């Protein structure tokens, strides 16, 4: 990190001040939180497909482990919702299960973390995310998760942020 050029754009995923068990230095985290943000918006069907491909072991060899992890979520989302998820797992309705987890757990947790780390990106009264025109994060829509889509998005981001400096 000592070799970073402060005048160059650095792209980071801003989910947490922790990377595993290591903590990002406070000043670095503060600068990241104050920097310009771009939210990647991806259609749900592609998010579900990506998760199923990258975590397929939870559908095959590690179903018991998945069920254990769901148990931990009861405190956050309630017994009724976790029981619904268990039913989806038992019925092997994987697409529906993943979408439910994303909508009712992951996305909500991500928004809450974002509100803590980037409060200026949210409207104080409504709690809703501000648009770029209101001083909030920009949004970049990715129509799918193909390599060429990522490449184009990276080019667009580099061009956009090069203009900032």
Role assignments for model-derived ranges:
Residues 30-165:
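Conserved NTP phosphate-binding and transfer environment spanning the P-loop NTPase/kinase superfamily
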Residues 1-26:
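Conserved nucleotide-sensing/catalytic segment adjacent to the nucleotide-binding pocket
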């Amino acid at each position: 990190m000592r070799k970073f050029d402060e005048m160059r754009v650095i792209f980071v995923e801003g989910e947490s001040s922790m990377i595993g068990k290591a903590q990002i230095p406070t000043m670095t985290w503060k600068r990241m939180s104050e920097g310009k943000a771009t939210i990647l918006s991806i259609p749900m069907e592609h998010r579900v497909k990506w998760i199923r491909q990258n975590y397929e072991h939870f559908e095959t060899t590690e179903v018991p482990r998945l069920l254990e992890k769901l148990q931990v979520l009861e405190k956050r989302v309630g017994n009724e919702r976790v029981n619904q998820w268990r039913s989806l797992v038992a019925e092997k309705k994987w697409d529906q299960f993943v979408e439910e987890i994303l909508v009712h757990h992951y996305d909500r947790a991500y928004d809450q973390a974002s509100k803590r780390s980037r409060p200026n990106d949210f409207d104080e009264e409504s709690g809703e995310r501000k648009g770029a025109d209101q001083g909030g994060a920009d949004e970049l829509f990715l129509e799918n998760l193909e390599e060429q889509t990522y490449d184009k998005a990276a080019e667009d981001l580099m061009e956009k942020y090069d203009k900032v400096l």
